[in-house]
């Protein structure tokens, strides 16, 4: 490998290289510890239940991704055409909240709305109709929660792409008399296609590594995913051999998916930075579909927020504020969040700056060495999906177990 380009690379690139490669080394070390533990125990595990869990994990992740991407794309298309209505700005801003919302808060909100004693059940009792029953649990509950968290994220990202469509393209499609479907296929879909594929891979990985949602709403071992199965093997059964096997499968599958997702570029140089202005009204049928889509989604998305706020307003905050456990948890959360966010931002800026340097022919010589390091840095940015937090914690548990022994 030719490293001559390193002599021309700015010294400011070194922190990014150190940060990115450190993350990869950490992931490889965790995998090595898990593998060594498995090799020491012989990996004498019945593979039938492991394959069954893997099949269920792929199934729910694939179905969740399909539903999330379909709803997200439809909502983004609807919002891009319906530019003016009361609360549009608030709704678009609210779409970004799902990615920072704690998973358990989302689960509690969905249960408060769709649970056996939730708002929907009370509304059904009021009108004498059948309630949702256990709809929010099992596979339907898992899918519902995944769509609730991921569809807004998809819609927000795709809406930004649609808003950057040059007005000339829209003017040309209108002058040609294209139907809404033909306009979408010829003008709008090419603008969001690359983003759509990249987002699909990301959403699939998020659903594949889902833990809290499956644990709380799964309702049955039949719907266990790999992460939940690892948790049960360690926490409930202390079957380390099975946990090691599941963790190895999880890391290998996720790493392969991350490599595949990294190959999908999320860029399109043909788009401008102009704001889209809707000057040509769509046919009545298309407008009705857009309005109905926005209304149903707004009701589905906002009602769990309101349920959480309503339930929280009825809480005994006076007693909570005087509990020592609450004070300890609050201080711990603030300290961990502050330190983690500061370290994360610093490492992200360093990795991003180094990756930009490695991709610039004016700063480095573009050869196999620079491209390899650039690919490794891209992989390090998605390492949290390749080695999920539960698997990482399991690896640390094995390390601590060896040290204490």
Region roles according to the model:
Residues 7-39, 48-163, 191-218, 243-261, ...:
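Membrane-water interface segments at the C-terminal ends of transmembrane alpha-helices
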Residues 112, 212-238:
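Glycine-rich helix-loop "coupling/hinge" segments at transmembrane-helix boundaries
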